[in-house]
Each structure stands twice: as C-alpha cells, then as structure tokens.
Design a protein with these regions (language model features):
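Conserved beta-ketoacyl condensing-enzyme motif
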Residues: 10, 34-160, 189-197, 286-302, ...
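Acyl-CoA/ACP chain-elongation machinery
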Residues: 41, 180-202, 207-219, 252-266, ...
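Flexible, low-complexity linker/loop segments at domain and module junctions
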Residues: 1-10, 94-98, 282-288, 316-320, ...
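Active-site pocket-shaping loop/turn-to-helix segments
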Residues: 15-18, 63-84, 119, 128-137, ...
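Condensing-enzyme catalytic core mediating Claisen C-C bond formation in acyl metabolism
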Residues: 7-11, 34-39, 210-282, 291, ...
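Active-site-proximal alpha-helical scaffold in enzymes
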Residues: 79-91, 138, 142, 146-149, ...
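ACP-dependent fatty acid/polyketide chain-elongation machinery
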Residues: 1-69, 90, 236-248, 344-359, ...
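Glycine-/small-residue-rich "gating" segment that lines the acyl/pantetheine channel
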Residues: 123-129, 170, 174, 191-241, ...
Length: 863
C-alpha cells in the first residue's frame, strides 16, 4: 500500500442480528457455526414459500437508543443500537467536529412505509402521519444515527441493494483519505418487511430451510435483518487517542454488470472486476489473500457466479488455496446491512486469526469447487481478507481488509501533528464537466430549460406548473413532465418492464453522454461509471408491487414489478443501455441527492477509479409521494379553482419531477479527447446539522427553525470572507450547517490545479431553499455570515419547482448555463429577474436534504 495514503483503521464495531444484540454475541455464534434462522414472529408469513428468516428476537423496547430517540421503525432502531455499541467499543466519548456517517440500506423505512400506506388506504389521518413519512425516507436511518451520536460532517446514505453495506464502508474510508472526515461511522441497516418477503417469494428465491450457501443441495436464500456499524478513523486520529485497532481498511472496488436486472453475470465478469479493482488499489497480490467472506446467498446462480468471479480475479491456483465462507448461512441475507455485518465478521476474523465457517454445508457442487470452510471454524494466520457483496441491478462491491500493523512513523507523525499523509498532499486529478442533460416540465432539451429561465419575469415561469391529485384525490400544484416520450430513447420492447424512474434515468444519461461526445465502447466501458442520486426513488414501482399484495396476499406478488423496487435499479438500467460498466453506486440524500452523487463521482475521478462518470439524479411524482410531502406540511396550499400560480407570500414549495445528468471527467482525459469543457468542479463541502432531522415540516417554511442549520452562534468569532481575508479552516467548528459546507467547498482540493480556492469569493450562489421567499431570513443570512460582500443569489426553482432529489442538479445545470451565457436568474426578495452581462468565474451551488444534510459545490470557469 502506498505510504503516501492516510491509513484508515477500524476502532469500533457494533451489531444486532438474529444471533444477538452485540458484535461479541455475533462473533461467538459464528465461530461455532450456529445459525439464527427460525420461524418469523414480527410479520405474518402465511402463503409464502418460506416462514423462516434471520429475525432479530430482541424486543425493540429493550433497545436503549431507540427508546431515547422515540422511534418505532425497526431498521432505525437496529442502526441506533449498533451505533451505540460501536462507539462504546471504540471508546469515543466525544466525536470530532468533522465526523461523518455513511449507512447502506436496501429497504430504508419500508416498515414505516407499509404502515403509512395502510393508514392512507384506510382513510386514517392523524398527527402520526408526518412522523411516519419522515421514517419512510431512505436517508432517515443515516440522519437519525447522525443526530443521535452528534455528527456534524458528511452524512451519506447508499442504496445499492445488497451491496450497500460494503459500499458504505468503502465510501467512508474515501472520506477519511480525502480529508473530509477524521472519524466516520459506517455500516448498514435493514428490517424484514412484507415487500422483501413477497418480492423474493415472487422470484422463487426463498428456501424453506436455513440456507445452504455453496452446498450442492442449496435451493434458495434465507432473509435476515439487523444492523452493523464500524467506527473508522484515520490512523493518526486513532493513535493520538490510544485507541484499540481491530484491523485496517485498505481499498474497495465497485463495478456494474450491465447484464440483467436481477440475475448475476453467469461467469461473474462484473464481480471479478470489483474484486480485482479492490486488490489492485490496495497493492495486494491475488495470491496474498488469505480469506474471503463471500456473498454466498444459497441460490444456485449467485453462488456459482461468485465462484467463477473469485477464480477470474485471483486466478485458479490462488482461488483454490484461499478459504471462503458465508456469514449468511448463519444470520440470513441482511440485504443492505449484509456487507456491514459481514465486514465486521471479516474484521474480527483478522483480529482473532480465525476463519468462521459456512454453516449448513452438506455436499459439494462441481460448480462451487473452492474451499468453503464447511461447518467448522479454522485457526489460521491471516494478513489480508476481502468481503464480497453483489446485488440486484448488477452492483458489485469488494472491500479489502488487513490485519493491523502500526506504521513505523505513526507515533512520530502524531507527535509532530503531521498532515503529510492526508489526501490533500497527494497529486490528484482535476475534475471537469463535459456533458449535461435534463428532462423536466420545461421539456427535454437544455435549450428548453434555458429559454424558460431566461424569461425576465418570475411570474411567467408559473405557466409550466399544473395540477395533480394526491392519494386523497385532492388537487395540488406541481411541476410535472408533459412532453417526455421514452420511445425516443428506449424501444417499446425494452421499456415494458421498466418503470418511469428507470426510463427517465436512462434517457437523461444517454443525452448527457451524447452532449459530451463520449462514446462508450468495449475498450473504455469499464472506465466509465454511473453514480445515481434520488430522494424518493422507486415509489411508483413500490406502489404497483405492494398494493395487490396488501389486498390479496402472497399470490399477488408480481415478479415483473419487484426488481424495480430497489433504488439502484435505475443505475443498473443505465449500465445495460449505455454499456457504462465502471464504478456504480446509488446515493440517497433527500433533495441534495444530485449534489451527493456529484461529490461521490468527483471523489472517484480524483482517486483515478474511472476516467469519466455520469452523475445523475431523478425522481417522479405519484399521488402517494405528493401526500407524503403534504403530510409534512411542505407544499404550497391549493388556493383556488384552476390556480397554478400561487401568490408569492404563501409559504411552501411546488413539488416537481424530472431528471438531470452531467458527465464528469478527469481533466487529462477530457483534454486527450479534445472535449468541450463547461466548467471545473473545484471543490465541495458536505455537512450535517442534527437539529433539522425531525423538523422537516418547518425547516424550509420558517426562518427560526431553518436558522439552526443555516446560521451560526459563533459567527462573531469566525468572521466573514473577503478577497484578502480567508477564514481559517480551524474556525469551521464555530460555524454551522450550510456555512461550513460553503467554507469546505471554497477550501477545495487545488494542490495540483490552477484555481487557488482560498482566494475565491464566488460571483453568485445558487440557493438550496425551495421557497424563494424564505431565502431572505434564512439562507441569505447564512451567506452574509460567510461573505463580507454578499454574492448574487440565484435560482431556477421558480421555473420547474423543487424536483426532489434532482433539485440541486437543476440549480447546477442553470449555474453552468449562466456561466456560459453571461445571464443570471437573480433572486431579489421573493422575485427573480434576469441579470444581464454578468461575469461569472466562480459559482457556489448549495443543496439541502430538507432534514439536516447540506452540500455546497464550487464551479469554476475553465480557462
């Protein structure tokens, strides 16, 4: 491993599974080969092909953290319990200001969503609805954990189905190496739900017996539930406080199959690339791998494909010498939490120098012919171990761990307070934007969006708004698609089993690649990635799949709809339709999801994981999505018959749907192919403000509540930026929320670039707030705390509304066009007018999740 990289170590672990309420109980049980797959008690399993699962038997009311936070969502409760234990084992009494949290989940708040839907369909209305809707949010688990433990740095939710937990660990390590955090809680959480049980039942994937991974008589998987959280730290931070270190996290690899919505590539091609990428980045030779914690689900196709992948990545000889085992044989498949809990088992295997077994193994299979450590643990000297996770949508993830050996210079570095090993001192790729695309109420062309924005009268833009019905058949003002035709991009045959979200995502990705003039070929396809962001994801498919099950039971579970219920399916469709099979991930960060996707893409480009990445965000409107926002009190009231232009003094916003995509590349790659460059991404900031997690119903309507996240109690000490006076990074602790995000973006990562971001004061800032009238008391004040001379404020939300997870993407697109055209849709109080002939060299684009997460991205004109 390069000695220039900051080491990332594991100092704390926490888990709650079918084998107990702690990581210690988990480890002792798996060493014995004990499984916890028994009759399910928390949900009714009548009519399904299996009635067993790896269910957590611990009553939720006994979980201290869940009680303290007043949540009744199982997944959130599991995550809180695991986080509590992880911090206890890490011995961390107080987290540093830049601490982060990255959580992987496949199901998010599905249990709460099921209850909320049942209430809606029964016509029940009460004060609990807003609380349930907040628990439905996929980013709710990470933000609740962040709030509970006191996180102020980046809070990220990854939803790459069954690969999410491993992806979360890898991304958390990247945040530490890049200097964005010194401590990160990383892991995953999921709870059993009728959606998951009926879905896997519809695919005929469940076994009626405890699953038998890799065994010749395997016939399906066993579902599970729980959570796993690891505390990751920079080695320097851990050494400085004398922390116990369990293991080191080396690197991780991501890839997309681009093959099929549910089935793995039969030869494990994509999975092999993820394994090879992780090993190559780690500097670990394939024959040095001592142990593989396998994906091992117990389904015939998955296990044989993984066996092929291991052989392809390691080579036949090395693969035959390496021990493999499946933790799922003992706890079931924890879906988005699988990689997290299995990562903990891998870490403990290295720490204790024991390889846990594959339980329930009865007979060999010619297609699974490796050493699967059947039924009994093995003591062995271990240096390197990997954890594999592969998922629906063709997402593949591999994380490499190493038995910890202190760096020879770690003590001296701590004593000298050295920062030479941080990523800021490394040579990194500059990142540029070379392609853009959008689909919205304004149309499907970039010119259509700009034409609507360029109207020099904010009232005229309301002509794009129309009406839609919520779940109670009440009319609502929305911004919806009108002239989008998916057959212009996708054949009718191909689109039959795709939902609207998938079609939108594929279409906008195709347009962005076309605009960038980047052709994806067999030669470069593994170097072109896809990072997808969404706030509400697959709600359309969830409704189509779950409603018949709710009324008719197991026989109504439709296998055509179930694959589209996972949030990463859209990114998988992009890989299949464009051939972009490089790094692939899906991030959920509320209305800042596009910004989070772009930040992640930026990191991968800088790490040289890809030459180009399509960063996308998309969301669609359904009656139940509209009702969810209404329950939270976020939307503009529908005032009058046919009213589609609400008065400016109303509080709330107009909800929209649409998609946005940008192609980001390394500067060297863009120059080599003579690409047109729209702008450079010079830096980004991601922060979290815990006070906003349970204030979604007021955070964008009342300055007093939003103030907690946007404004600082310590601004007098911090001071404001001027061209000649730069606030010290150490003073970020006196800031809050969006202020810290903007300052981090301006700090940048410009050691190798021409842009000296410490001297930058942006010419304009595209605001995060959906309601223009709220910019004065809230976001404007936060901006004034950072900048002595307030930059121009701008927005396009008066045109297309608040497009959920794509909201910050449309702001960024408009910022690029403004920089190109020299015109700016400038905010004046509660109105927007076009400022002409403006010089725009640097623009900040702010984003907010609505519930505590903030992003700020610095765009600089490329010259």
């Amino acid at each position: 491993v390069s000695n220039q990289k900051q080491k990332v170590v594991v100092t704390g672990i926490g888990a709650i599974t079918a084998l107990g309420k702690s990581a210690e109980e988990l480890w002792h049980a798996v060493l014995q080969g004990t499984h916890g797959i028994h009759q399910v008690e928390s949900i009714v399993m009548d009519g399904y092909m299996a009635s067993i699962a790896g269910e957590v038997k611990q009553p939720l009311e006994e979980l201290q953290a869940a009680q303290a936070f007043k949540t009744n969502d199982r997944a959130i409760s599991f995550a809180l319990r695991a986080a509590e234990e992880a911090l206890q084992t890490a011995g961390l009494q107080q987290l540093p200001e830049d601490s982060g949290c990255v959580i992987g989940t496949c199901l998010g708040g599905f249990k709460s969503w099921e209850r909320w839907i049942e209430q809606k369909q029964a016509g029940e209305q009460g004060e609990g609805e807003a609380g349930l809707w907040r628990q439905v949010r996929f980013n709710g688990i990470a933000e609740t954990v962040g709030s509970y433990v006191g996180i102020h740095g980046p809070v990220v939710t990854i939803s790459t189905a069954c690969a999410a937990g491993g992806n979360a660990i890898g991304h958390a390590a990247d945040l530490i190496r890049s200097g964005k955090a010194s401590v990160v809680l990383a892991g995953g959480a999921d709870a059993l739900s009728i959606v998951a049980v009926s879905g896997f039942h519809s695919l005929q994937s469940l076994s009626s017996e405890p699953c038998k991974p890799y065994s010749g008589d395997r016939d399906g998987l066993s579902l599970g539930e729980g959570a796993g959280i690891l505390v990751l730290e920079s080695e320097q931070h851990a050494a400085a406080r004398g922390a116990r270190i369990y293991a080191e996290v080396l690197e991780f690899g991501l890839s997309a199959d681009g093959y099929h919505p549910t089935a793995p590539h039969p030869e494990g091609e994509g999975a092999a690339r993820a394994i090879a990428m992780a090993l190559n980045k780690s500097g670990v030779q394939p024959d040095a791998v001592d142990y593989i914690n396998g994906h091992g689900t117990g389904t015939p196709k998955n296990d044989s494909a993984e066996t092929m992948a291991i052989k392809r990545a390691l080579g036949e000889d090395a693969a035959n010498r390496t021990k493999v085992s499946s933790t799922k044989s003992m706890i079931g498949h924890l879906l988005g939490a699988a990689g997290a809990v299995e990562g903990i088992v891998t870490v403990l295997a290295l720490h204790h120098q024991h390889i846990p077994p594959t339980a329930n193994y009865t007979k060999p299979d010619p297609e699974c012919d490796l050493d699967y450590t059947p039924n009994a643990a093995v003591q062995q000297n271990l240096t390197y171990a990997i954890s594999n996770n592969f998922a629906f949508g063709g997402n593949n993830c591999c994380v490499v761990f190493q038995a910890y050996e202190p760096s020879a210079s770690s003590k001296q570095e701590v004593e000298a307070d050295s920062t030479d090993t941080t990523a800021a001192s490394l040579q990194r790729e500059r990142v540029v934007i070379t392609g853009i695309a959008q689909i919205s109420a304004a149309g499907t062309k970039i010119s259509s969006l700009w034409d609507a924005i360029a109207v020099n009268d904010s009232n005229a833009a309301n002509s794009l708004w129309t009406e839609a019905l919520d779940a109670n058949h009440n009319r609502t003002v929305v911004s919806k698609l009108t002239d989008y035709d998916s057959t212009q991009y996708i054949s009718r045959k191909e689109s039959r089993r795709m939902d609207t979200l998938g079609k939108l995502t594929v279409s906008v990705a195709m347009d962005a690649l076309k605009d960038s003039e980047l052709e994806v070929t067999e030669h470069n396809c593994n170097q072109v990635g896809v990072i997808f962001g969404t706030a509400n994801g697959t709600m359309e498919s969830l409704e189509q799949f779950y409603f018949p099950v709710l009324s008719e039971g197991a026989p109504a579970a439709n296998p055509a709809h179930f694959p589209n219920t996972v949030f990463n399916q859209a990114a998988g469709q992009v890989a299949m339709h464009t051939g972009a099979r490089g790094v692939s991930s899906t991030v959920v960060d509320g209305h800042a999801s596009f910004s989070s996707a772009l930040c992640m893409a930026y990191q991968h480009i800088q790490n040289k994981d890809a030459e180009a990445i399509v960063a996308i965000a998309a969301d669609v409107l359904t009656p139940y999505v509209i009702s969810g926002y209404k329950d939270s009190g976020l939307l503009l009231p529908y005032e009058a018959e046919g009213a589609v232009a609400p008065p400016v003094d109303q509080h709330g916003f107009v909800l929209g749907e649409g998609a946005v995509a940008v192609v980001v590349e390394s500067l060297s790659h863009a120059l080599a192919r003579n690409a047109t460059i729209y702008a450079e991404v010079s830096g980004y900031g991601r922060t979290f403000e815990a006070s906003q997690v349970n204030a979604a119903d007021s955070s964008f309507r009342k300055g007093s509540d939003y103030q907690a996240g946007l404004n600082s109690t310590g601004r007098e000490e911090a001071g404001a930026l001027t061209q000649s006076n730069r606030t010290a990074v150490a003073e970020l602790a006196t800031r809050s929320g969006l202020e810290r995000a903007m300052l981090q973006a301006l700090q940048g990562d410009c050691s190798e670039g021409e842009v000296e971001s410490e001297d930058i004061v942006p010419d304009a800032i595209f605001i995060a707030q959906p309601a223009i009238d709220a910019a004065e008391p809230a976001e404007r004040e936060a901006i004034e705390h950072v900048f002595a001379d307030t930059p121009m404020l701008a927005t396009c939300k008066h045109v297309i509304g608040e497009v959920q997870g794509a909201a910050s993407g449309f702001q960024l697109l408009t910022a690029l066009l403004s920089m190109q055209q020299g015109y700016l849709p400038q905010v004046h109080g509660s109105a927007v007018s076009l400022a002409e002939d403006v010089s725009l060299n640097h623009i900040l684009v702010n984003g907010a999740s609505l519930t505590g997460s903030y992003t700020s991205i610095l765009l600089s004109k490329y010259e």
